[in-house]
Each structure stands twice: as structure tokens, then as C-alpha cells.
From Swiss-Prot:
The C-terminal region contains the docking motifs PxIxITxC and FLCV, which are required and sufficient for binding to host calcineurin. A motif (PxIxITxC motif) lies at residues 205-212. The keyword Cell inner membrane does not apply. ANK repeats lie at residues 48-80, 87-118, 124-153, 158-187. A motif (FLCV motif) lies at residues 227-230. It is found in: Host nucleus; Host cytoplasm. This is IkB-like protein. Pfam families: Ank_2. Transmembrane segments: none annotated. Induction: Expressed in the early phase of the viral replicative cycle. It comes from the Viruses. GO terms for cellular component: host cell cytoplasm; host cell nucleus.
Length: 238
């Protein structure tokens, strides 16, 4: 009877219970548990997601500020490099969220040298790629400001953050990046990749790179007709 539940199942139930209180914003209870066991922030559920990750996922900035005050130096207690079963870190989840202030809080606390901005998951996806896929312009610019490399490629498809922004149809992000970095879009998304998308996924991307003659969505800053431009596809892929 003393081993009614496996230890890993008990751990998962406990983290699930803590996760529920994080979602509900019960900071007082969390503070009591933290005083008893500070390493509670690194305990994980069955998916490998730590308590610190769930604080980031639920966007509890009050929890984050409490944790940061408890450390003598960044990373003393919090293992912000911990990854779940898919290889995602807390930064991967923060990069996908709309509230970029939480991402700025974490990046500002751990600093440029205190966290691995370009840490990929098991598919080679970095946080800046996740931000590009979701169209989180402010998140992507914050990550780049703290040292993220937007030209790094994932393992399976060989796409950079620039490629994902174009492929997923995030027009505002594409325009913002092109305006900020003044690079022709054809450098980010070569035409040959369109054929790769078609063969692999049996569908066309939402944005394609086309000539600057007809149905042009937007011209590049240089206004050079020899440059390639962005054209938005309709539902028929034209």
C-alpha cells in the first residue's frame, strides 16, 4: 500500500495542481510553497514542462517578479534553459505569446549573456522562428535585439525566421522586418523554395515572391522594378 502510485505519477499530479493555481493567479499559495522548496520552479509534469515554463505560458508577470526577487543572481534557482519533451524552452513559449512585455521582462533579467537566445528545439526551431510563425513582430524584434539570429535555419526544412514569416502570411511582420533591415525580400525567400513547399506540403504558401509588374502587394523601399516583391495569394492560390 505504501507504493500505491508511481513516483513520476505523483510528481505529475503535484505539478498539475501547482499549475492550476498558477492559472488562477494564486500568488500567495505559490509563495508559501516556494519558501518551503525553492526548487519547485524546476519540477516538471509528464510532458517535461517545468513550473517556470507554465508561469511563462500563463503570462503571470507577478509570479515572475516574485521569483526574480528571490535570486541573488540570475539563474541561481531558475533553470531557464530547461526543455520539455519536444525540446522547447520557456523562450519558445514566450515568443508565441501576444504580450511581449513578459518576454522583455525575462530577457532583460537574464541578460544577453545569461540565456541562450538561439537554443533550438528538437526540430531546429528557435524562439525567433516561433515568433515569426505566429506573426509576433514585437517579440521577434525583442529577440533580435538580445542577440537572436534570424538567419539560423531549422533542421528539417532549412527555413530561417524570414522564410517562416513569408510562408505563414504574416504581412505586417514581413513589412516591418523589410523596413527595419532594408534587405530585398528575395534574399530571404528564394523562388526555388516555392517548389519545395509544393512538393512537401502539397499546397502553396500564403505569400509568394513575384515580379513587380501586376498584382503587386507592396514595393520594396528601393522602388526598383528589377527587385522581387510580395504578392498576397487569394483562396485559389493566384
Amino acid at each position: 500500500m505504501e507504493h500505491m502510485f508511481p513516483e513520476n505519477q505523483i510528481e505529475n499530479l503535484f505539478v498539475g495542481w501547482i499549475k492550476k493555481h498558477i492559472r488562477n493567479g494564486d500568488l500567495t499559495l505559490f509563495e508559501e510553497f516556494f519558501k518551503t522548496d525553492p526548487w519547485i520552479v524546476n519540477r516538471c509534469d509528464k510532458n517535461g514542462s517545468s513550473v517556470f515554463m507554465w508561469i511563462c505560458i500563463y503570462g503571470r508577470i507577478d509570479f515572475l517578479k516574485f521569483l526574480f526577487k528571490q535570486e541573488s543572481y540570475p539563474g541561481e534557482i531558475i533553470n531557464h534553459h530547461r526543455r520539455d519533451n519536444d525540446g522547447n524552452s520557456a523562450l519558445h513559449y514566450l515568443a508565441e505569446k501576444k504580450n511581449h512585455l513578459i518576454l522583455e521582462e525575462v530577457l532583460g533579467y537574464f541578460g544577453k549573456n545569461g540565456t541562450r537566445i538561439c537554443l533550438p528545439n528538437f526540430n531546429g526551431m528557435t524562439p525567433v522562428m516561433k515568433a515569426a510563425m505566429r506573426g509576433r513582430t514585437l517579440n521577434m524584434l525583442s529577440l533580435i535585439k538580445f542577440g537572436a539570429d534570424p538567419t539560423q535555419k531549422d533542421y528539417h526544412r532549412g527555413f530561417t525566421a524570414w522564410d517562416w514569416a513569408v510562408f505563414t502570411g504574416n504581412m505586417e511582420l514581413v513589412k516591418s522586418l523589410n523596413h527595419d533591415y532594408q534587405k530585398p525580400l528575395y534574399m530571404h525567400f528564394p523562388l526555388y523554395k516555392l517548389d519545395v513547399f509544393h512538393r512537401w506540403f502539397k499546397k502553396k504558401p500564403k505569400i509568394i515572391i513575384t515580379g513587380c509588374k501586376n498584382n503587386v502587394y507592396e514595393k520594396l523601399p528601393e522602388q526598383n522594378p528589377n527587385f522581387l516583391c510580395v504578392k498576397k495569394l487569394n483562396k485559389y492560390g493566384k
